[in-house]
């Protein structure tokens, strides 16, 4: 090959006869470019960058680029690029495309054999993939079409079928889509009756053209004029001038020179003026080394002159430049904190890690050394805000969830007057009587008016004696569910639960500070699960409060779970009625919001039952469908009722006078 680099698409020129004449080097260059394209088609999906989406290969000015696209973890090639590859190979083979449209139709007809889902994917019009391919000039339109998988396209088979169609048209006298214009297509003879396939015949012919190429029959002047008129459009060909080809001149073979012996930047004549550097070793050092004989056996025959001619790999950065020393502590660990002798250890007693063999490190190691792992989480060591487990105030269906400001202040004033006398009533304190089964009747219907006023005053007293706060009384929490946090530890020692709280020790030493299982001495199971209300600052409380006689776990409950939560299990034999169980606070399924204006909704399981208490003032109540009965009362009866009642309030007497006045007027 010559020293000049020739552009691929400009290696041929058309003579007066219409045929193309090439030099053997140009034919070899064409075949090499075909091999380069085949290499790209085989290895394009390899060695991609992290965010790379497309990889291109330049064909020529006419064909442009062929692209490999990475989309949805798959590599694709378009039908347009497949046609470009076939056309490019046909031109480099030496056949010029005469009818481009008919040539493309033949290749697209062969591509119909590649089915969707197996060898290709069918994209919708103007999809994201088609839009990307169209922007990168891989497609001519964004219509609905197939995009082929990269390794599913048989490029060699498509090229051989296209060439076979043209050769058959030429043999039958039809107009072919391509015609032979240069080597190796001019010298190729197709044997249709041969057992060898067309592609194998092409391969054998190309191999023969590489080894025994025909000499050019064109004169030297024509070739010189051809190369001078050549248009160069690549950086390589533009940077170097193409030397004219001279016939009957055999060039000398190119000598391969080692890169290490080449002189860069200076001519050969000027490079001889410089003297290479030499390593100068003092004679005293050599004599001292010879006298002491401290050379190693492997380096005994090493001479200073060998350093200059040594391999470059030996001049790498030495690995022993930085001295590496491993220090092992010779001091024994402090064994003064042994809780048991080495011989007395039992496998059941070693509940902790045996990394330190049941010992702690001495004071010579600081805490910041981080020898021990932290067995605790930081959020578990944070002190809680409350030292006692307290349930939130239960939501009740027997009282309203909403309270106006007037009700709150009125209850506060009444509570100051009466004190806490309402606490001494029976268990039915604060509950109203719902024995009246007449849902639609008024409060005064079917009743004696004197009894109505008595019930009204009694209900008002019951409402006044009720405590306004919504928290349960103190005795309501005196059950096993509300055991304080300090009593839950029971007989557990402070040092066993939190060994680093009362001692000035490192918390990282907790795993290895005990050699004996603490549960053997305690007699109880420690509470290992965290619970609400546990406070590290209250660990000394067990010294003040004596432990209980019976030890309960943290999740112990004195009442059955079904009765506690009022949950009806489907596995029970009998279905208990709601009245059979009386939980000491309202269950979850009964915590329903009630109305602030219609107070009779506040009782659970009792709806639309009116209470006996009179309606509140300044509140508009819904009228009843039934007209109330008019009851004629005399002033004497009213005064007798007030005297028997025992409580003469200003509001009650004024209301009775107003009622009697209205009745007298009627």
Swiss-Prot record:
Pfam families hit by this protein: STE
GO BP annotations, alphabetical order: regulation of pseudohyphal growth; response to pheromone; sexual reproduction
Comp. bias (Basic residues): 414-423, 623-638
Physiological role: Binds to the DNA sequence mediating pheromone induction (called the pheromone response element = PRE) which is found in the upstream control region of several a-, alpha- and haploid-specific genes. Involved in the mating process.
Composition-biased stretches (Basic and acidic residues): 425-435, 655-666
UniProt family annotation: Belongs to the STE12 transcription factor family.
DNA-binding residue intervals: 51-161
Metal-binding in keyword set: no
PTM characteristics: Phosphorylated by the STE7 and STE11 kinases.
Name of the featured protein: Protein STE12
Localization annotation: Nucleus
Skewed-composition ranges (Polar residues): 1-24, 214-237, 438-450
GO CC annotation: nucleus; Ste12p-Dig1p-Dig2p complex; Tec1p-Ste12p-Dig1p complex
Species of the source: Kluyveromyces lactis (strain ATCC 8585 / CBS 2359 / DSM 70799 / NBRC 1267 / NRRL Y-1140 / WM37) (Yeast)
Principal subcellular localization: nucleus
A GO molecular-function annotation: DNA-binding transcription factor activity
Keyword Cell inner membrane in record: no
């Amino acid at each position: 090959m010559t020293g000049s680099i020739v552009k691929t698409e400009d290696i041929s020129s058309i003579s007066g006869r219409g045929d193309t004449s090439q030099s053997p080097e140009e034919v070899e260059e064409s075949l090499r470019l075909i091999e380069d394209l085949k290499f790209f088609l085989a290895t394009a999906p390899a060695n991609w960058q992290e965010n790379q989406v497309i990889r291109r290969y330049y064909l020529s000015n006419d064909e442009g680029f062929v692209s490999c696209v990475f989309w949805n973890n798959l590599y694709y090639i378009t039908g347009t690029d497949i046609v470009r590859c076939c056309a490019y190979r046909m031109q480099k083979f030496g056949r010029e495309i005469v009818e481009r449209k008919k040539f493309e139709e033949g290749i697209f007809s062969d591509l119909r054999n590649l089915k969707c889902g197996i060898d290709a994917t069918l994209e919708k019009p103007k999809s994201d993939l088609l839009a990307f391919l169209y922007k990168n000039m891989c497609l001519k339109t964004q219509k609905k079409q197939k995009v082929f998988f990269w390794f599913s396209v048989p490029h060699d088979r498509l090229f051989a079928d296209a060439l076979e169609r043209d050769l058959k048209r030429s043999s039958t006298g039809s107009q072919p889509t391509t015609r032979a214009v240069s080597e190796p297509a001019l010298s190729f003879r197709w044997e249709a009756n041969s057992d060898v396939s067309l592609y194998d015949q092409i391969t054998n012919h190309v191999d023969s053209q590489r080894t025994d190429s025909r000499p050019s029959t064109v004169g030297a002047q024509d070739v010189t004029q051809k190369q001078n008129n050549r248009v160069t459009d690549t950086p390589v060909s533009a940077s170097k001038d193409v030397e004219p080809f001279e016939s009957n001149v055999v060039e000398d073979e190119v000598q391969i020179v080692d890169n290490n012996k080449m002189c860069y930047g200076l001519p050969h004549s000027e490079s001889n003026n410089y003297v290479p550097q030499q390593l100068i070793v003092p004679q005293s050092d050599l004599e001292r080394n010879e006298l002491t004989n401290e050379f190693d056996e492997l380096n005994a025959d090493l001479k200073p002159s060998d350093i200059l001619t040594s391999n470059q790999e030996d001049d790498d950065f030495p690995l022993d430049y930085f001295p590496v020393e491993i220090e092992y502590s010779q001091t024994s660990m402090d064994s003064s904190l042994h809780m048991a002798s080495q011989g007395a250890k039992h496998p059941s007693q070693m509940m902790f890690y045996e990394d330190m063999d049941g010992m702690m490190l001495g004071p010579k190691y600081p805490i910041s050394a981080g020898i021990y792992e932290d067995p605790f989480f930081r959020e578990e060591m944070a002190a809680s805000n409350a030292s006692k487990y307290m349930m939130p105030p239960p939501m009740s269906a027997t009282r309203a969830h909403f309270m106006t400001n007037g009700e709150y202040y009125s209850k506060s004033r009444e509570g100051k007057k009466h004190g806490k006398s309402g606490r001494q009533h029976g268990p039915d304190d604060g509950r109203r009587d719902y024995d009246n089964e007449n849902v639609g009747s008024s409060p005064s219907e079917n009743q004696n008016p004197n009894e109505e006023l008595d019930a009204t005053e009694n209900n008002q007293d019951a409402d006044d004696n009720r405590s306004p706060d919504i928290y349960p009384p103190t005795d309501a929490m005196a059950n096993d569910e509300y055991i304080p946090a300090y009593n839950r530890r029971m007989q557990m020692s402070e040092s066993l639960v939190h060994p680093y709280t009362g001692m000035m020790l490192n918390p990282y030493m907790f795993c290895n500070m005990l050699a004996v299982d603490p549960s053997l001495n305690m007699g109880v199971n420690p509470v290992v699960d965290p619970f609400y209300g546990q406070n590290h600052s209250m660990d000394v409380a067990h010294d003040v409060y004596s432990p209980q006689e019976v030890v309960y776990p943290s999740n112990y409950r004195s009442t059955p779970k079904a009765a506690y939560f009022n949950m009806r299990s489907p596995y029970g034999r009998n279905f208990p009625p709601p009245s059979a169980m009386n939980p000491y606070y309202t269950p979850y399924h009964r915590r329903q919001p009630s109305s602030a204006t219609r107070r009779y909704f506040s009782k659970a399981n009792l709806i639309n039952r009116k209470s006996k208490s009179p309606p509140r003032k300044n509140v508009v109540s819904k009228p009843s469908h039934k007209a109330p009965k008019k009851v004629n009362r005399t002033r004497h009866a009213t005064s007798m009722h007030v005297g028997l009642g025992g409580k003469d309030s200003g509001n009650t007497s004024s209301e009775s006078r107003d009622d009697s006045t209205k009745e007298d007027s009627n």
